[in-house]
Amino acid sequence: MSFNDQQCKQPCVPPPCLQKTQEKCQAQAEDVCVSSCQDPCQDKCPQQAQEVCVSQCQELSQGNCPQQGQDPCLPPSQDQCLPQCAEPCQELAQTKCVEEFPQKVQEKCSSQSKGK
C-alpha cells in the first residue's frame, strides 16, 4: 500500500529529471570507462564506471527531482522525488555501464592489439 520499489519501477514515461540524469550518467560512465581506465580490457573498467554512474546519479537525481515536482512515476500525493526514485536511474545507469560500455571497451580492445 505504501510507496515501494515496485511502484517506483513500474513502467512509465521517465520524468525529465531522470532522463537528464540518465544522459549525464551515461556520458560520465563513458568517460570513466573509455578514458580513465588504464587498461580498457580489464574487468575493473565497467565496475569503475558503475561506481561513478551510481554516485553521479544520486547527486543529480536528488538535485533535479525536487525541482521537477510532479513526476509521472510518483503517486499524485507525492510532490517530491523520494530517495527510492533515484533507484530506477541508478539501475538504468548500471545496466548501461555493464551492458553498453563493455561493448565499447571490446571495440577499443579489438581495435588495439589484444594484449593478452
UniProtKB/Swiss-Prot annotation:
InterPro entries: PRR9. It comes from the Eukaryota. This is Proline-rich protein 9. It comes from Mus musculus (Mouse). The gene is Prr9.
